[in-house]
């Protein structure tokens, strides 16, 4: 009994001391320090376990070993329980600090807008598709034949002057290459690919002219239409234009045709509409396809006739939505784009 009572008493004291330290820990790091101090390799309880081998009496050795092992197991369990408790407290603290106030108003959902040019092109295309027009697209870099020659625009015509048209330095098949000045070039391509009408197409797209002010831009957009078939008349053209304008401006519009001149149509006309201030405003040009244009694409003008029309997308948007400066379309001002842009849901009904 010589070493039994002092050792067991020391084990009990160390166990109670360690449990008190565990209970006082406020972090995992402090728990790790207590674990090392008592049951680590150099810990106090570990040192007592090493002394067991020096006890000669087997019964005493067994009793001390049992007490020491029980103390170590109890301390490990206390540390484990305290770790779980600290984790719960930490979680509750984090949840309390991150709590969401459900009474706060939701953040407004911001979304992009469809650019007014894209929106108006879709709007125009949708209306004309109701009349059976198919949408076609073509190259913006064209040769002189499709932009000028085939459209009955001779070499000396002012539209072909270099101060109005962007010419490239390289040639294609011996012809000069230009940035197209109108989308009428697609009408030529459509008739070339289908020499046996009917042909009923519109060609929206970007065009280029050397001009820049409040009402002109070197890059702008057009939509041009073509209908070729037997027995096509100016009456068909007038009905088509009136239907389109009434649908586009969402009201019954009063129109007038003024005689004009375009090299690719004969007769030619410009269409005016009365605005809300009862003033006549020009909106587009049109006319019957010139017989020379039909001949240039191997369509018999004695058998077929057609009409064509063209409009500037920016101009149509300015007239409909009260936009005063064409340059705003390309200024990238977010406030302006948010005001005049189309929401996706606005486009669904027009697509």
Swiss-Prot record:
What does the entry list as the binding residues for Mg(2+)?
266
Q: Cross-referenced Pfam families, in alphabetical order?
A: Phe_tRNA-synt_N, tRNA-synt_2d
Describe how the cofactor binds.
Answer: Binds 2 magnesium ions per tetramer.
According to its UniProt entry, the protein's GO biological process terms are: phenylalanyl-tRNA aminoacylation
This entry's Enzyme Commission designation comes to 6.1.1.20
Q: Could you tell me the keywords of this UniProt record?
A: Aminoacyl-tRNA synthetase, ATP-binding, Cytoplasm, Ligase, Magnesium, Metal-binding, Nucleotide-binding, Protein biosynthesis
- Cofactor(s) needed by this chain: Mg(2+)
* This protein's GO CC annotations: cytoplasm
Q: Which cysteines are joined by disulfide bonds?
A: none
Molecular function, one GO term: tRNA binding
Which catalysed reactions does the entry list for this protein?
A: tRNA(Phe) + L-phenylalanine + ATP = L-phenylalanyl-tRNA(Phe) + AMP + diphosphate + H(+)
Under the heading InterPro entries, the entry gives:
aa-tRNA-synth_II, aa-tRNA-synth_II/BPL/LPL, Phe-tRNA-synth_IIc_asu, Phe-tRNA_ligase_II_N, Phe_tRNA_ligase_alpha1_bac, Phenylalanyl-tRNA_Synthase, tRNA-bd_arm
Highest taxon of source:
Bacteria
Q: Where in the cell is it found?
A: Cytoplasm
Summarize the subunit comment. Tetramer of two alpha and two beta subunits.
Give the family from UniProt: Belongs to the class-II aminoacyl-tRNA synthetase family. Phe-tRNA synthetase alpha subunit type 1 subfamily.
Q: What is this protein called?
A: Phenylalanine--tRNA ligase alpha subunit
Q: Which organism's genome codes for this protein? A: Anaplasma marginale (strain St. Maries)
